[in-house]
Every structure is written in structure tokens, then in C-alpha cells.
Amino acid sequence: MRLVLEEPFKRLWNGRDPFEAVEALQGKVYRELEGRRTLRTEVDGRGYFVKIHRGIGWGEIAKNLLTAKLPVLGARQEWQAIRRLHEAGVATMTAVAYGERGSDPARQHSFIVTEELAPTVDLEVFSQDWRERPPPPRLKRALVEAVARMVGDMHRAGVNHRDCYICHFLLHTDKPVSADDFRLSVIDLHRAQTRDATPKRWRNKDLAALYFSALDIGLTRRDKLRFLRTYFRRPLREILRDEAGLLAWMERKAEKLYERKQRYGDLL
């Protein structure tokens, strides 16, 4: 069994079974799936997000593997990713409770509780009208570079997101947002993978997903080149020469994802 409790849950759950206590938490349920529940709760006026994972069974695990999908078996992936990103200086959530019980991955019970990041707006919402009403050029440049740095630092730290879309980057709005003063945090790491080094295959999947998610916000060629230069931390001439295969693949992959979105909506 693994268990880490910080305040206020260390105090609230003192003398209680934390796996029963977390199941008893009340709040707004955001997702209820077989084997996983996500909700927002409040303690002492402060918001927290709770993800509870219950064993999905060997049948579901096998079905995922047969369809080339890596199943999410518990909260450990998000816990490990959050810890690694904090070590690397990448702004993300803060976990205040984590528990894992059971060695059988098909029946394991686990949970993670993170502090709510608020007030915030995700970049998909923030940029949704950029085509019609472009943002100040300096702000757009600053945001493009900030996302590129975050994703680059994340990958160099050995973490790949697997859901690397602009909606999973939160812009903090506790004060006016400007090119010279803003904060971003990356969230929703329940599918993230953490290794000593990020394999190119998974790095490339993240980059293609990010590019796809930004296709409709009016980015120019110059914006895209700025992202590449910041992400790779190399001269553009070298990037365009050495990463030509990746860039062509990203275009094709993003186009396929975009076509699927047009056909099926958000059910990718």
C-alpha cells in the first residue's frame, strides 16, 4: 500500500481508512466512468479535484491492449508525473493526497487529490475567437513561447502527456493577463507517462496533438516557427533540416485528427 497525505486531508482523515474517506467525499462530479470517478469538492472553502480509480478488470485491460491503447490502471501515473514536473520546474497541479492499495492491476484501488487551480481559463477557451479578434501580437508571441518551453521542459524531464491539447494548459486570471505578466499551468496528467527520457514516438504524438488542437486559432507560419525554435532550443535552420520528417508527419497526423473531429465532433 502507498499513502501520502498532506493538509487538510492529513487532519480530516486522521484515524480513518483513507480509501473509504475519499469515496465519501461529496461534490460536483465531472466524470463517472467504469473504474474512474472525477469530482470537485471543497474543504474549508478551498476547492480540490479528486480522481478515484477502481480496478477495471482484466477483460477491459485486454481490450485496451488489443486495440493498441495503453490502459490507465490507477492514480500512480498522475502522481509520478506531477512529482517529476515539480522537480523540473514545470508549473502544474499540487497533489495533497495520494493512495494506492492492491497489487493486482485489474482490481487496484487508488486515488489522487489535487488543489484546484483557480481562477483560470484554458487556452482553448482563451483563444477561441482569435481568428476574428486577434490578440495583441506580443501576448500571442509570449503565450506561444511559454507553451513551447513548458512542453519542451516536460519532455526533457521524461514526461509525455498523451492528451497534450491546448485545453489542458490553464492561464491564471487572478490578475490581468499581459505579455509581460502571466502564468500557465499544465493539467490533466492521468494518462501521462514518466521515464528517464521521453521516447521520440511519444514526444511526437504530444507535438502532433498540440498542433492539431491549435489549428483553428489563427496561428501564422511565424508563430509555428517561433514555437519550434523555443521547443527545440536550436537555430531554425537546423530544426527545419534535421526535423523535416517529424514536421511532415505532424502535418499529416494533425490533418487526420482534424478530419476525425469534423466527422465525429469531440469523440476522437
UniProtKB/Swiss-Prot annotation:
GO MF annotation list: ATP binding; kinase activity; non-membrane spanning protein tyrosine kinase activity
EC number: 2.7.1.235, 2.7.10.2
Localization annotation: Cytoplasm
Keyword entries, A-Z: ATP-binding, Cytoplasm, Kinase, Lipopolysaccharide biosynthesis, Magnesium, Nucleotide-binding, Phosphoprotein, Transferase, Tyrosine-protein kinase
Enzyme active site: 163
Pathway: Bacterial outer membrane biogenesis; LPS core biosynthesis
Stated consequence of mutating residue 163 to E: Loss of protein-tyrosine kinase activity
Reported regulation of activity: Acylated-acyl carrier protein (acyl-ACP) acts as a very tightly bound cofactor necessary for the production and stability of active WaaP kinase.
Record note on what altering residue 69 to A/R does: Loss of protein-tyrosine kinase activity
Catalytic activity: an L-alpha-D-Hep-(1->3)-L-alpha-D-Hep-(1->5)-[alpha-Kdo-(2->4)]-alpha-Kdo-(2->6)-lipid A + ATP = an L-alpha-D-Hep-(1->3)-4-O-phospho-L-alpha-D-Hep-(1->5)-[alpha-Kdo-(2->4)]-alpha-Kdo-(2->6)-lipid A + ADP + H(+); L-tyrosyl-[protein] + ATP = O-phospho-L-tyrosyl-[protein] + ADP + H(+)
Top-level taxon of the source organism: Bacteria
PTM sites of type Phosphotyrosine: 30, 48, 98, 165, 211, 231, 258, 264
Record-linked InterPro entries: Kinase-like_dom_sf, Lsacc_core_hep_kinase_RfaP
A GO CC term attached to the entry: cytoplasm
Pfam families: Kdo
Predominant subcellular localization, coarse grouping: cytoplasm
Effect of residue 168 to A: Loss of activity, cannot complement a deletion mutant
GO biological process, one term: lipopolysaccharide core region biosynthetic process
Cofactor(s) required, per the database record: Mg(2+)
Recorded domain comment: Shares similarity with eukaryotic protein kinases in the conserved tyrosine kinase functional motifs.
Quaternary structure and partners: Interacts with acyl-AcpP. The WaaP hydrophobic channel can accommodate acyl chains of different lengths, but myristyl-ACP is likely its physiological binding partner.
Described function: Kinase involved in the biosynthesis of the core oligosaccharide region of lipopolysaccharide (LPS). Catalyzes the phosphorylation of heptose I (HepI), the first heptose added to the Kdo2-lipid A module. Also has protein-tyrosine kinase activity: autophosphorylates on all Tyr residues; in vitro can phosphorylate poly(Glu,Tyr).
Membership in a protein family: Belongs to the protein kinase superfamily. KdkA/RfaP family.
Name under which the protein is recorded: Lipopolysaccharide core heptose(I) kinase WaaP
Organism from which the protein derives: Pseudomonas aeruginosa (strain ATCC 15692 / DSM 22644 / CIP 104116 / JCM 14847 / LMG 12228 / 1C / PRS 101 / PAO1)
